């Protein structure tokens, strides 16, 4: 597979506005070496405050005993025999259980246990910084503590959306407004470089030695993949998409709709960080289309109505950014 030649890029109907000069990625051999050595992501904003830490390890195959030990620390006034639990099974890599006493779950602690070896893909310290940053701007629940292999945080009231919901105009506009709010969170000091290329090089380093040379000829060789990655970086860095704070993983189940308060909030900040604004938008649209299992549904999304939804989403997302500035809420 040859590296594709350069081609002029067509003008999009919506231009992602850059409000401040954006430093382009300039990965050199030192940065590639840093990624291959397992270095953490470029640092984001500093933590707002210290987070409680408990030296407790929760068995991912038997989560309840460890979760209840943490609840004794976080809610000492709760009687152990009265604590109720509810497991969530939508997660792909992590284990999640809710602990509460009252039926309405108004005071509910979520205990999340990291998936095995996910630290190879996720910078957990950076995740905590993201959590605190978003909380400070009114976009995340309270983070109660971290422990050896996970964290505890406030349960967010509402329902996780499905693919049948995010096409509704009222809801996709709420999603666009929440995305716009997050995108206007300003970095302290100079704007960080996009996290995209660091992650791509890091992922590539993790898998390059695991590719079986006996695989089909349809699977590109490592050298070809490396060339394509360099080509992508060279050309995508020239598109002048603004670098903003992004969620970077906006699949349906990471969007919570609160019908009482009339808003949506995003959850799971493992991959959040400063990145190209266009990536966050495209990632959400990709999850949107990828949620449909049947060819009929896929063509429905790709058709005229899908185009109208995309245009309306972008109009809602980009319009507030002319004047909006998000300041910390606490």
Regions found by a protein language model. Name each.
Residues 245-247, 252:
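Catalytic-loop of the protein kinase fold
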Residues 253-292:
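Catalytic activation segment of kinase domains across protein kinase-like and atypical kinase folds
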Residues 3, 217, 323-330:
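Helical subdomain adjoining the active site within ATP-dependent kinase catalytic cores
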Residues 2-86:
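Juxta-kinase regulatory segment immediately upstream of eukaryotic protein kinase catalytic domains
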Residues 64, 68, 197-204, 208, ...:
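An amphipathic alpha-helix signature
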Residues 56-60, 120, 218, 303-307:
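Amphipathic alpha-helical protein-protein interaction segments
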Residues 278-326:
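Active-site activation/catalytic loop segments of kinase-like enzymes and analogous catalytic loops
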Residues 86-231, 235-245, 260-261:
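ATP-binding pocket architecture of kinase catalytic cores
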